[in-house]
Amino acid sequence: MPLVPDPQHPGAFRVVFGETSQSWVDPARPDLLLFEYVVQVSLLFEHGLADVGQGERIRVIHIGGAGLSIPRWIAWRRPGTAQIVCEPDAGLTEEVRRKLPLPPRSGIKVRDVDGRSGVAAMPPDYADLVVLDAFDGAWVPGELVAAEFLDELARLGRGRRMVICNVTDSSPFGWTRRFAAGLAERWRHLLVGTEPAVWKGRRFGNLLLAASGTRVDVTGLRRDSAKQPCPYRWIEGRELRSWIGGAEPFTDADMQDSPPPSGSKLWFS
């Protein structure tokens, strides 16, 4: 999964797996977010953690790292944030450190460990935010969406504040609905969003799921999302419960990787 220079943006690189871009980073411009879903993650951060005072230090855990675009943005947006990244690909991490070094005192620590092992080693009530953005090639590993792992994520959350998950799927979203069912059993509030074309079944694409102990400012999120070049449509409440329907959460006994891509352009971490 090499780092490939972006010829249209000097100094920036893509992390590429096959024909899929896994990450895009300009180390000199951590505020510059190219991938649509990463922009939406930034909006979830703004509207989901709005109640945290500026003087309060936030702790964030990332399951999956790639080029560290989201950790870099958080460090830029909220300096002093403590961030731990669980990234099992030590070779990729070394290449990122060499070609896209983190700024001094970024607060970002990368551990060469998979998500389940990394989370199991962490103390309870540690994190204000968990970002699950991990792919094995073009698939989300099934072990990261099973109920047993979601229990571990719930254990980490201070006040069960927020978990943001990036996955890929297509209509009728059978796999994502099962994942959403597991999140809904453990967190009071849940949002699911994607681009209208994905909702309508026109193509395969990224979906974001945001589970939280306190309600996200959904009105503000929808307003700011609508201003983006590729806005997301967000569902919650009764509409979301109807969408989940009778889907049963995954467990370790029947876990499945996410569905394979169907040729659409996908953005990962």
Model-derived regions, located:
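A short, structured beta-strand/loop element
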Residues: 9-25
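C-terminal substrate-binding/active-site "lid" region of AdoMet-derived donor-dependent transferases
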Residues: 147-220
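A generic structural signal for alpha->beta connector loops
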Residues: 80-82, 105-107, 160, 187-189, ...
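Residues that form or immediately flank small-molecule/cofactor binding pockets and catalytic motifs
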Residues: 20, 90, 115, 195-197
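A short, flexible beta-alpha/helix-coil linker loop
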Residues: 20-24, 135-138, 170
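SAM/dcSAM-binding transferase cores
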Residues: 1-6, 22-30, 199-269
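Generic beta-structure capping elements
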Residues: 18-20, 132, 214
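The AdoMet/dcAdoMet-binding core of the Class I SAM-like
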Residues: 9, 13, 32-155, 173, ...
